């Protein structure tokens, strides 16, 4: 099974999506789902002494402007194992450029954690935590000589619109799943 192509984008898109976790919170290893095989591949070990501040992955059957599946960050209290499917509620979007390409990332919370039941939009996330996430993504490629720019945060509605657009981009690239 290749989860990128065979999993649906979510049970109630765009209100609830599947986050296919590639990288657990706290990791310095950057894993990526191999789009051809569906296996997890070590892409690189971060050059910097940083670690991922959130669980990080993709939304299945999506494609984005950077030429990859649409990225999703899930705020969890405990790290999740790679290749875990998390039902996630989008609450915002980080507006970012990576080497000049639009590389926005959905920010979400797990549906099945009562701790986050009242987190519905970006304003529900403590600003200090948003700043930590932005700082990580602003700096994590610096020692590789690559440039990333975090331009700010969008709300849940903006995230949901981008999810729907990413699903359409997937259909254009790979064909509509029957």
Swiss-Prot record:
SUPFAM superfamilies: Inorganic pyrophosphatase
CDD domains: pyrophosphatase
UniProt subcellular location: Cytoplasm
Gene Ontology CC annotations of this record: cytoplasm
InterPro entries reported in the protein's UniProt record: Pyrophosphatase, Pyrophosphatase_sf
Transmembrane segments: none
EC numbers: 3.6.1.1
GO MF annotations in UniProt: inorganic diphosphate phosphatase activity; magnesium ion binding
Coiled-coil regions listed: none
Binding site for substrate: 30, 44, 56, 140
PROSITE patterns: PPASE
Gene Ontology biological process terms, A to Z: phosphate-containing compound metabolic process
Catalyzed reaction equations: diphosphate + H2O = 2 phosphate + H(+)
Residues the record lists as binding Mg(2+) 2: 71
Residues engaged in binding Mg(2+) 1: 66, 71, 103
HAMAP family: Inorganic_PPase (MF_00209)
Subunit structure: Homohexamer.
UniProt function note: Catalyzes the hydrolysis of inorganic pyrophosphate (PPi) forming two phosphate ions.
Name of the protein: Inorganic pyrophosphatase
Organism of origin: Thermococcus kodakarensis (strain ATCC BAA-918 / JCM 12380 / KOD1)
Taxon lineage: Archaea, Methanobacteriati, Methanobacteriota, Thermococci, Thermococcales
């Amino acid at each position: 099974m290749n989860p990128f192509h065979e999993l649906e984008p979510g049970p109630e898109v765009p209100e609830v999506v599947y986050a296919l976790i590639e990288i657990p919170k706290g990791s310095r290893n950057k894993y990526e789902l191999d789009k051809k095989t569906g296996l997890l591949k070590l892409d690189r070990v971060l050059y910097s002494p940083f670690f991922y501040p959130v669980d990080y992955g993709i939304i299945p059957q999506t494609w984005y402007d950077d030429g990859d599946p649409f990225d999703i960050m899930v705020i969890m209290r405990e790290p999740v194992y790679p290749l875990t499917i998390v039902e996630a509620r989008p609450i915002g979007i980080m507006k970012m450029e990576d080497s000049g390409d639009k590389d926005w990332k959905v920010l979400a919370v797990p549906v099945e954690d009562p701790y986050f039941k009242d987190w519905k939009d970006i304003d529900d996330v403590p600003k200090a935590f948003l700043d930590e996430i932005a700082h990580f993504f602003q700096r994590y490629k610096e020692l590789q000589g690559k440039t990333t720019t975090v331009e700010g945060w969008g709300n849940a509605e903006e995230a949901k619109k981008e999810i729907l657009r990413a699903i359409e981009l997937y259909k254009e690239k790979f064909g509509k799943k029957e």
